[in-house]
Amino acid sequence: MIKLEQVVEILKKDNNFREISSAGEYYFNWPKEVNFDQLSYDSRKSTKDTLFFAKGLNFKKEYLTDLEAAFYVSEFDYEVALPAIIVTDVKRAMALIAANFYKFPQNKLKTLALTGTKGKTTSAYFAKSILDKMNGGKTALLSTAQTTLDGQNYFKSELTTPESLDLLEMMAKALENGMTHLVMEVSSQAYKTERVYGLTFDVGVFLNISPDHIGPVEHPTLEDYFYCKRQLLKNSRYFVANAEMNHFAIIKEELNERKIPHAFYGADSENKIIESKGLHFVTDGSVSGEFDIRLLGRFNQENALATALATKALGASFENIRQGLASAIVPGRMELLTAKNGAHIYIDYAHNGLSLENLVEVVEDHHAGQLFLVLGSTGNKGESRRKDFGQVIENHPRLNVILTTDDSNRENPKTIADEIASFVSRELDFELDREFAIKKAISKTQNSDDAVIIAGKGADMFQLKDGKREPYIGDSPAAQKYL
């Protein structure tokens, strides 16, 4: 429960309160006592004791006409019968009010937040596995792929970083379930849309940056994308950053100026990988020793080093780190299947140019035969990825490519595929039925020298079409049918 008086006080302290509007009158303080038993931004879940948040570009006045709620919070006075708390920024208001409503669960959990263009989910699972070794399995996880609030039962995530109201509720539930630590991915959109406003993380990690999510729906420019991601820096008590990432200089400069304790990793830093072979690697620095992970590729080893440094800052021992990394399983990340003829099938969530480039390089290094790539791209978001995908394909002439459907949403998947193909000088194959595209690629393999890469969906069991998630067999189950 939270009182209206408390809500107004929170907003005033944040310089985010304009007035209360009711029946044509305006109030700086409401004359009566009002208690809210629930917070919601979903009209279907609102009750007479709900404080409702009217947010979103597509919000309409009619949504409030028959709404059952006590008050609504908005940047705009819709002049309906329901009393309104008018604010400057409804998203910031929701974040701070939710934190108070759920009794500040973020202060009772040890939190580790990860950002970067690629590798967030893999690193999140690495970190959870390490912390579980330290705390006996009391680590909650919020990732792009899955969410667990009790450390054991997982459900599909809706967003990389949930809306602030949902996020604070999840944190509170994690505490109720006896969790002591939380690992979460923080997207650039989370900062752009104030989903993590008011939160300070115990440890923040910045893995890398490359052009992605650039488009009219997400970030207009790379600068905006990078700036939003950098907000994690000043909202972390300790910070881990990749010294080899693009534009590292400004990160180093800002960390030093803000006097935030930190650790860097990479070839030219104190913490580095000095030996790498297959699934085994050796590190030097503050976490020095030999490690094994279940994923191929140096970039995965670099992510492992980043999480080793981050979890060490939370108290993990060398053995916690070594055992945690060795046992970590990441769904939809370089999942490996073997066909009857010995060919390897790699299923990976790689959904931007940088992650696809790294994935292709690893597979090329391990397979001398034919290489097949099954790939699509999302519709109505991340439009810049299509050019990036085309350039990766162009730069790797060994790839036999079958362009297919990803989460096409409200765009024509053939139009998306054609755009990818426009950046490639050689002929590509098209099969818009994703399962048949997978079948076709596997059927073309001959022996253990060959490999198929199925990229973009990972462990997703749906395809986004016309704004709705439609059931999809999943890349792994589809591939298993045709091995």
UniProtKB/Swiss-Prot annotation:
- Binding-site residues, UDP-N-acetyl-alpha-D-muramoyl-L-alanyl-D-glutamate: S43, T160, T161, S187, R195
Record PTM: Carboxylation is probably crucial for Mg(2+) binding and, consequently, for the gamma-phosphate positioning of ATP.
EC numbers: 6.3.2.-
Q: Part of which pathway?
A: Cell wall biogenesis; peptidoglycan biosynthesis
Task: Name positions with the PTM N6-carboxylysine.
Answer: K229
List GO terms (cellular component aspect): cytoplasm
- Gene Ontology molecular function terms on file: acid-amino acid ligase activity; ATP binding; magnesium ion binding
Annotated binding of ATP, by residue: G116, T117, K118, G119, K120, T121, T122
* One GO BP: cell division
Cell compartments where the protein resides: Cytoplasm
Q: Which UniProt keywords apply?
A: ATP-binding, Cell cycle, Cell division, Cell shape, Cell wall biogenesis/degradation, Cytoplasm, Ligase, Nucleotide-binding, Peptidoglycan synthesis
Q: What does this protein do?
A: Catalyzes the addition of an amino acid to the nucleotide precursor UDP-N-acetylmuramoyl-L-alanyl-D-glutamate (UMAG) in the biosynthesis of bacterial cell-wall peptidoglycan.
Q: Mind telling me which NCBIfam families this protein's record contains? A: murE (TIGR01085), PRK00139.2-5 (NF001131), PRK14022.1 (NF010628)
The family classification in the record reads: Belongs to the MurCDEF family. MurE subfamily.
Q: What is this protein called?
A: UDP-N-acetylmuramyl-tripeptide synthetase
User: What organism, scientifically named, is this protein from?
Assistant: Lactococcus lactis subsp. cremoris (strain SK11)
